[in-house]
UniProtKB/Swiss-Prot annotation:
InterPro entries referenced in this protein's UniProt entry, alphabetically: Aminotrans_V_dom (IPR000192), Aminotrans_V_PyrdxlP_BS (IPR020578), Cys_deSase_NifS_bac/arc (IPR017772), Cysteine_dSase (IPR016454), PyrdxlP-dep_Trfase (IPR015424), PyrdxlP-dep_Trfase_major (IPR015421), PyrdxlP-dep_Trfase_small (IPR015422)
Function of the molecule: Catalyzes the removal of elemental sulfur atoms from cysteine to produce alanine. Seems to participate in the biosynthesis of the nitrogenase metalloclusters by providing the inorganic sulfur required for the Fe-S core formation.
Name the record gives this protein: Cysteine desulfurase
UniProt catalytic activity: (sulfur carrier)-H + L-cysteine = (sulfur carrier)-SH + L-alanine
Family: Belongs to the class-V pyridoxal-phosphate-dependent aminotransferase family. NifS/IscS subfamily.
Keyword Methyltransferase: no
Binding site for pyridoxal 5'-phosphate: G72, T73, N152, Q180, S200, A201, H202, T238
Modified residues (N6-(pyridoxal phosphate)lysine): K203
GO biological process, one term: amino acid metabolic process
Cofactor entry: pyridoxal 5'-phosphate
Molecular function (Gene Ontology), one example: pyridoxal phosphate binding
Highest taxon of source: Bacteria
Species this chain originates from: Cereibacter sphaeroides (Rhodobacter sphaeroides)
Name of the gene encoding the protein in the UniProt record: nifS
PANTHER family xrefs: CYSTEINE DESULFURASE, CYSTEINE DESULFURYLASE FAMILY MEMBER
Length: 387
């Protein structure tokens, strides 16, 4: 039985074109891009080409900066630490209650260990940011606003361009964790007031272990990793050329992505579930949402059990984010949205890619309803509750 993979917000399959682009730099083109001799020239050229590809994917000015990192977590950490170092008189950060752990865990540490005040803006039942609470949190004491472009669990998209404008009025820098958005929705940074953006290659069919932090031209910056002068002194250490090349090729491929086709399959999935499974609800903004992401909560069914039973049937999904999976409590995102208790424990994330097929969606729709029925029959609430 061929496996159906519907967990693309956790990671994606490496594009064959990205792999082929990487292979020479794992073999004959092994040179250090900082070397002056001939062996370093091809890696140096590849580094520049990848930088241009990423800038094009995110619609950024050619003279802005791309800082290659080990992934989204390092990019987020670098942005937050740099903003705090840029103006020591500002010791406050504004973020949201539904950010990825890469941002929230660092903010928790800064608050507990370094005396930074963190404002965590709430969201409504669809995962939309409370704009009035956001406005109220902004002040001349805020060094940085860090808000995600799109949520990794529900797919809800934040209006980051307008949020960045409000941050600048208070004199704060604006960073967006766009790890789940890049490659899935069109992004044009040119002309916006966004200062920094994080991305990760493995979320759009590039390799794991490589990401990037985009910096708007003129943004004050302090490096997280010091040492050599690689990447204009912004990140020390010999660059991961094979990974960066794979990131660049994945960026080129993502520019031609058909988001509309993925959206149609996601809608087919949601409509099919709602038609076949009573007491199911789609979580997230009904309109402003990633085209590949569907978070569905099933009343009176345990999400972890749904995941395990689907896995036995050869279908890969997740309950909440993979980074938070394993806990029996609903994720912090689901809790922040105040999803009712009976549904919160049954939240499942389905995330598609351009490789997802209609046949795979139909396979899920065949297998899922009896699994939910089976689990509800075991529920202490009883199967009668869902009728």
């Amino acid at each position: 039985m061929e496996r159906v993979y519907l967990d693309n917000n956790a990671t994606t399959r490496l594009a064959p074109e990205a792999l082929q682009a990487m292979l020479p730099f794992l073999t004959e083109e092994f040179g250090n891009p900082s070397s002056l001799h001939g062996q370093g020239r091809a890696p140096a050229r590849a580094l520049m080409a990848a930088r241009r590809a990423v800038l094009e994917l995110i619609g950024a000015e050619a003279d802005s900066e791309i800082l290659f990192t080990s992934g989204g977590t390092e990019a987020d950490t670098t942005a937050i630490r740099s903003a705090l170092a840029a103006d020591p008189s500002r010791r406050e950060i504004v973020t949201s209650t539904v950010e990825h752990a890469a941002v929230l865990a660092l903010c928790d540490h800064l608050e507990r260990q370094e005396g930074v005040t963190v404002h965590r803006i709430p969201v409504d039942g669809d995962g939309r940011l409370d704009i009035e609470a956001y406005r109220a949190a902004l002040s001349p004491r805020v060094a940085l606003v860090s808000l995600m472009w799109a949520n990794n669990e529900t797919g809800t998209v934040f209006p980051v361009e307008g949020l960045a404008e409000l941050a600048h009025r208070a004199g704060a820098l604006f960073h967006t964790d766009a790890v789940q958005a890049v490659g899935k929705v069109p992004i044009v940074l040119r002309g916006t007031e966004i200062d920094m953006l994080s991305l990760s290659a493995h979320k759009f069919h590039g390799p794991k272990g490589v990401g990037a932090l985009w910096l708007r031209k003129g943004v004050p910056f302090q490096p997280l990793i010091r040492g050599g002068r690689q990447q204009r002194g912004h990140r020390a250490g010999t660059e991961n050329i094979p990974g960066i090349v794979g990131l660049g090729r994945a960026a080129e491929l993502a520019l031609g992505g058909d988001h509309g086709a993925v959206r149609l399959l996601r809608d087919r999935l949601e409509q099919g579930i709602l038609a076949r499974v009573p007491k199911a609800r789609v979580l997230g903004d009904p309109l402003d949402r990633l085209p590949n992401t569907s978070c569905v909560a099933f009343d009176f069914a345990e999400g972890e059990a749904i995941v395990m039973l689907l896995d036995r049937a050869g279908i890969c999904v997740s309950s909440g984010a993979a980074c938070a999976s394993g806990a029996m409590e609903p994720s912090h995102v689901i809790r922040a949205m105040k999803v009712p208790f009976t549904a919160a424990h049954g939240a499942i994330r389905f995330s598609l890619s351009h490789w997802t097929t209609a046949a795979e969606i139909d396979r899920l729709l065949e297998v899922l309803p009896p699994i939910v029925d089976q689990l509800r029959a075991l529920s202490p609430f009883g199967a009668e509750e869902v009728k």
